[in-house]
Structures are given as structure tokens and as C-alpha cells.
Amino acid sequence: VTVLSSALDPAAPDHRAHREAMLAKLADLDAEHAKALAGGGEKYVARHRKRGKLLARERIELLLDPDTPFLELSPLAAWGSEYTVGASLVTGIGVVEGIECLITANDPTVRGGASNPWSLKKALRANDIALANRLPCISLVESGGADLPSQKEIFIPGGAIFRDLTRLSAAGIPTVAVVFGNSTAGGAYIPGMSDHVIMVKERAKVFLGGPPLVKMATGEESDDESLGGAEMHARTSGLADHFAVDEPDALRQARRVVARLNHRKAYADPPLAEPPKYDPEELLGIVPGDLRTPFDPREVIARIVDASDFDEFKPLYGTSLTTGWASLHGYPVGILANARGVLFSEESQKAAQFIQLANQRDIPLLFLHNTTGYMVGKEYEQGGIIKHGAMMINAVSNSRVPHLSVLMGASYGAGHYGMCGRAYDPRFLFAWPSAKSAVMGPQQLAGVLSIVARQSAAAKGQPYDDEGDAALRAMVEQQIESESLPMFLSGRLYDDGVIDPRDTRTVLGLCLSAVHTARYEGARGGFGVFRM
């Protein structure tokens, strides 16, 4: 056992200052999460309850096994846009009859649960997670279809929702739809393309065209119930497999459907693991407010891995990147964590070798980000930083074991790519409130623009406006700073959620458990050409 020793002093002024700054960021985050929980606001929640209906999260709660966790995904979707935070959809992973399932629930208190561009992105991300991890998919449906004013952004890409449902089914991943209210127009294909369909009596309405559209198109008079009611679909069309008397009955029946799926995880759950030897509360004070100040990622690793036990790989070589083996909730993991921000040639080669080893052993990889990117300068360009950085990115791109990423601090430039950023398909990616991600730091980006403008003016023989330059730099810095914050990026679905650092071990444990529903095998060779 190689237990990490900790040099962290929780009473030190620096630690206390970092902790206070993190708590302030968490308070801001809670306020944004509260907006998602509030849905369409008091008026629409009251109207929904008056109709005798449960809210989206109440439906999920009744569906899940008692006292089991629900890992909500993309809760801040649409943050900073014209749409409601959460994007009128709740998605996440929960346990139903002992089986981990991917659950999506429309929030009908937000514009009737209608889909907007961010709900679409959020639903597609949920489908990707279900497919990659072979999680049964349960849709709790109550939606008026597409939000018509934004149809130009939804209609064409929105077809992927139905494509995904058929692909899940074709891959042997069960899909279940429980219809609580309207599921009209395009929304009618959700139950139409699910393996199992449950509808609530006198509430579920599933049709391609409602009475007004039918009247306009054919001249036929009809009503909701005869056109698409639950009883009609249960008795006549055969679209409903199960007929429920009310919402709790529908959710009870959904649980019975899942119990009968004969769906098994590819791997047995590991035995109960020993918790870390250090207090997770101390994670709040590790990341400095100024991300240019380095911190030791071993202090983080010591507070998230089983028994704080970590076997480091190449500890004396490429020391800006910490690599090594550990277990997390009993699951073996290989960890890559940035130690001093910048990645040099040595770190890149070390990472490529470590990723290959993890693939040889079929061990998932955890990337802990705090990087400003790859080193620049004459010495490093001549030393081959491009080909060595490319080697690391090649290894990450072609690795076949599951990857998990957590942005703790900076995640800038190609360093974000090398550390398995969103474009590299990690199974899950979460951010701490202290994280920042952009093409480069705000000061660097503003400075580069300033230098280019100054050189351009000199080449034309024009005087340079220093006052205007200072104003431009300030404006660019402010813009890049605001666009690199975790809530902004989470709103755009560039992560799966912004989490409290103290929850990191729990969140990663839930992710690793979900990952082990599907069988995986590392790449044996099969990496692109490494430039040596």
C-alpha cells in the first residue's frame, strides 16, 4: 500500500482564503441550480399541480429505488441563453429495480415541456451516454413537441432523437416510454420508437396531428381522446403496451417492466471500498483563486481515491504531469493529473506511454485538468513539442478504455485536448466551480491581439492608438473571462455538470458503476503513427 502523504494545512491562511472563494462560487452555483429546480415558476407549477399531476423530479423520485442516488446530468443546460435554465428537461442516471438506467423527463411547467435547441442537445447527450454505457433508457414524456418559434434550430437536427431510440433498441439496450400527457406531433414518435410503452388513462394524448390540424387537413371532426387517448391506444391502435389508471400506477408499472428486462451488467460490482484517509472537506481549499498559481494534484488524489492509496508512474520524469494507479469505489483507475500547468515534451511522452499501459490492462482513465497548454518558445519547438504533444493527443484519441474528465482549474489550448476534453468523447466530463476553459487565458489572448494590431499599424506606417489598445485589451479580457467560466460552458453542454469538489469521489463512483454496465476492451496497438 502506497498511501499518499499530505502537506496540506487546513488552518493555513492561503487554504482558508481558497476555501472561502470556493464556497462563494458554490453559493452562486446553488442559485443557478435553484432556477432549474423552479422550472416554469410558481404560477405554472401551481397550475400543473391543480391538474393533479406530479412534477418531473417527483416522477423520477417515484420511479427510482428508495434511498438510491440520482446523478443529474446537464442541469445548467441553456444557462446564459434566452431559454429557462435546465432546458425544460431533466436527465440523469438512477437505479430502478437494481438496474442503472438513463432517465429523461420533460418538465411540462416550462412552455408545456416543448423542446428548444438546448433541450435537444441535452437529450442527444443523454442518448450518447445510454449507448456508450449500455444503460436502459426510460423517457417520462409530457411535451407539446418542438418550441415552434425556434423550429429552424430544432426540426432538422431533431430527427436524431428518433434515430437514437432505434439504434439503442437495435443494440439490445431497452427503451421504455411512460406517457403522462401530451406527446404530440414529432413527440408521438418517442413512444412509437420505444420497446415498451405505458400510458396514463385520460391524460396521455399521443397523435401526429391534433383535432385542429386534422380538421384543417381533412375536414374531419375529432376529439383528443378518440384521436390519441390512452384507452384508444391500449384497445385499438396497440401503441400502448400497458394502461395505467394514474401517474403512480404508471410509474409502478414502469418499475415492473424494468424488473422483467433480464438486463445484466457486464461486470460484477466491486466489494465495499475503504474511504480516503483525508477529509474531502479539504478539497474546497486546494485550488487557488488565481489559476496561474500551481497546486499539487496529489492533494486532490489523496482525498478521492480508496484509502488514499496511489502508485505513481514515472514520478521523477515529466513532473508537470502526475500519473499513476489507484482504485475508486473499488474500480481500478489510471490517473493523469496536471501538476504545474504547462505540458512539455517529457510529460507528453509519459502520458502516451501511460495511456498505452492502461489500454493493455483494460483500466479506465481519469483526467484531472489544470493546464495552460503545451509549452511554446524556440527551445521547445526545436525540441519537438509539436510531435510530442501530437503523440499524447493521438494516444487519447485512439484509447479504447473508458475516460472520465474533471476540470479542476485551467483547461486551456491544446492541453484541453490532450487531457481528454469534450471533443475526445470522455464517457463523462464534470467541472469544479473553479475551472476555466478557453483557447488561451484572457490576458494572453488580449495581449496577442494587441501585438498583432501594433505590428499591423507599424507595417502601414500608421501611428498606434495606445488608449484604444488599452480599452480593447480590457474588453477582450472581460469577454474571454466570462466565456471561460464553468456555468457558461455548462450552459452550452460542454460538460455534464458543475459539481461541488466534495462530491467528486461520489460522482466518479456513480460514473464508474455506470461505465461497468458495458463490456470494454483497451486498444491493443491500433494507435495512429507516433512521430518519434
Residue ranges and their predicted role:
Residues 1-532:
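Ligand-binding clefts of soluble mixed alpha/beta catalytic domains
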